[in-house]
Amino acid sequence: MNPLIAAASVIAAGLAVGLASIGPGVGQGTAAGQAVEGIARQPEAEGKIRGTLLLSLAFMEALTIYGLVVALALLFANPFV
């Protein structure tokens, strides 16, 4: 493998995981904060808020997993070779 392609693939894999985790990380923090605030305002709706929060966190985490899949493809099944 060309060393330049290998180095670029490693850098791209790191950027893929790093950049793919920024948005979901901010979104998860905001969603959790709003859920805690909603439960504090209306404690009787805790179960409904928690269920909605967990579902939305799972969807947000999927974006990070997609970045990980791209990084693994760049590292182990490099299409540029």
Curated annotation (Swiss-Prot):
The terms under GO molecular function for this entry are: lipid binding; proton-transporting ATP synthase activity, rotational mechanism
Which InterPro entries has this protein been placed in?
Answer: ATP_synth_csu_bac/chlpt, ATP_synth_F0_csu, ATP_synth_F0_csu_DDCD_BS, ATP_synth_F0_csu_sf, ATPase_proteolipid_c-like_dom, F/V-ATP_Csub_sf
Can you say where in the cell this protein is located? Plastid, Chloroplast thylakoid membrane
Question: Which residues does the UniProt site feature Reversibly protonated during proton transport point to?
Answer: E61
The superkingdom listed in its UniProt entry is Eukaryota
What's the main place this protein lives? plastid
**Protein source organism:** Spinacia oleracea (Spinach)
Q: What is the official name of this protein in its record?
A: ATP synthase subunit c, chloroplastic
Tell me the subunit arrangement.
F-type ATPases have 2 components, F(1) - the catalytic core - and F(0) - the membrane proton channel. F(1) has five subunits: alpha(3), beta(3), gamma(1), delta(1), epsilon(1). F(0) has four main subunits: a(1), b(1), b'(1) and c(14). The alpha and beta chains form an alternating ring which encloses part of the gamma chain. F(1) is attached to F(0) by a central stalk formed by the gamma and epsilon chains, while a peripheral stalk is formed by the delta, b and b' chains.
Membrane-related topology note: Multi-pass membrane protein
* UniProt xrefs under Pfam families: ATP-synt_C (PF00137)
List, in alphabetical order, the GO biological process terms annotated in this UniProt record: proton motive force-driven ATP synthesis
**Keyword annotations:** ATP synthesis, CF(0), Chloroplast, Formylation, Hydrogen ion transport, Ion transport, Lipid-binding, Membrane, Plastid, Thylakoid, Transmembrane, Transmembrane helix, Transport
Q: Which family does it belong to?
A: Belongs to the ATPase C chain family.
Query: Where exactly are the transmembrane stretches of this chain?
Result: 3-23, 57-77
Where N-formylmethionine occurs, residue numbers?
M1
Q: Which GO terms describe its cellular component?
A: chloroplast thylakoid membrane; proton-transporting ATP synthase complex; proton-transporting two-sector ATPase complex, proton-transporting domain
Further comment found in the protein's record: In plastids the F-type ATPase is also known as CF(1)CF(0).
Protein role: F(1)F(0) ATP synthase produces ATP from ADP in the presence of a proton or sodium gradient. F-type ATPases consist of two structural domains, F(1) containing the extramembraneous catalytic core and F(0) containing the membrane proton channel, linked together by a central stalk and a peripheral stalk. During catalysis, ATP synthesis in the catalytic domain of F(1) is coupled via a rotary mechanism of the central stalk subunits to proton translocation.
